[in-house]
A protein has these predicted regions:
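Short, Lys/Arg-rich, polar N-terminal cytosolic tail immediately upstream
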Residues: 1-16
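A structural signal for multi-pass alpha-helical bundles of membrane permease subunits
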Residues: 18-313
Length: 313
């Protein structure tokens, strides 16, 4: 047998057609990713340093002027503050709610499937429809004010300056917090599923060992469950921060294109939307998008550093 025939009959040679077929299958998705994601990012960087016209394309090279104008704009500064505040409050609140719901439905309870579906339902409902419903609920004559009046809670709310006909989403003091509560309700079901998958990946042997050592439920949760959920925490926190920094539809529906009242609901993505599709200043909008990209990327790196990896047992 010569070397050529031996090579032809080797396992590596026999797997070569399968490898080629595999590369052909992934070629189209990889190409689309490079064009639609990496290509779009590179092009955004390119047009952000030009005075860009919708009809003629790049006209005048202006360097970092778009970035300087954006960072000097008081409205954009407000948008950054609102976006960071929303993310800083909404992310931990929703993670706590999601984990709490996951712990509940992870138990062997009667009607477990029903509760899982009920908790998850707001996440699959139309965001626009739920936001409109929430606006009616939180209106001056809405359900929330009516219920707290029936419960005799008006004096308590008046201590904080909120009258019996408080317009929660129309007041600069409460508008963003109202949106935070809305999104905590609608997205906690999704995070519940993420945490439920992480909880079910933990071996029962770990809990049995903790029980033998005399650990209480709280000790087992804090010393066993929480450390083993680090990868789950990282995934949920990353998804949440990316979503939080891109808050748009609820802010647009609740406060209009100007983020009313008084820019209380102005976010970075809403500001970007106005620059691109109301002012048609696409180079300026590209600069805003890249600032948002840097913020999201930096937040992801910080979370990776904080959560690290799960311990070995």
């Amino acid at each position: 047998m010569n070397l050529r025939s031996a090579a032809a009959g080797s396992p590596r040679a026999s797997r070569r057609p399968e490898a080629i077929a595999g590369y052909l299958f992934i070629a189209v998705p990889v190409l689309l990713f490079l064009v639609l994601n990496i290509g779009a990012l590179v092009y955004a960087v390119y047009i952000s340093v030009w005075k860009w016209n919708l009809r003629t394309g790049p006209v005048t090279f202006i360097g970092l002027q778009n970035y300087q104008d954006a960072l000097a704009d008081p409205v954009f500064q407000t948008a950054i503050k609102n976006t960071i505040y929303y993310t800083a409050v909404w992310v931990p609140l929703t993670m706590i709610l999601g984990l709490s719901l996951a712990l509940i439905v992870n138990q062997k309870l009667r009607g477990q499937t029903f509760f899982r579906g009920a908790f998850y339902f707001p996440a699959i409902a139309s965001s626009a429809a739920i936001t409109m419903l929430w606006i009616f609920i939180m209106a001056p004559d809405g359900l929330f004010n009516g219920v707290r009046g029936l419960l005799g809670l008006d004096p308590l709310f008046e201590l904080f300056g909120y009258g019996p006909h408080q317009n929660w989403i129309g007041d600069q003091r409460t508008a963003m917090n109202t949106v935070i509560l809305l999104n905590a309700w609608t997205t906690s079901g999704t995070f519940m599923l993420f945490y439920l998958a992480s909880l079910q990946s933990i071996s029962n042997q770990v809990y049995e060992a903790a029980a033998i050592d005399g650990a209480s439920w709280w000790q087992a949760f804090w010393k066993v469950t929480m450390p083993l959920l680090r990868p789950g925490h990282f995934f949920v926190a990353t998804v949440a921060v990316i979503g939080g920094l891109q808050l748009f539809d609820q802010a647009l529906i609740g406060g209009g294109v100007n983020g009313d009242p008084n820019n209380a609901l102005m976010t970075m993505v809403l500001y970007l939307y106005n620059a691109a599709f109301r002012q048609f200043n696409f180079s300026y909008a590209a600069a805003i998008g890249l600032i948002l990209f840097v913020l999201i990327f930096s937040a992801t790196l910080v979370q990776r550093k904080l959560f690290g990896t799960a311990p070995e047992w």
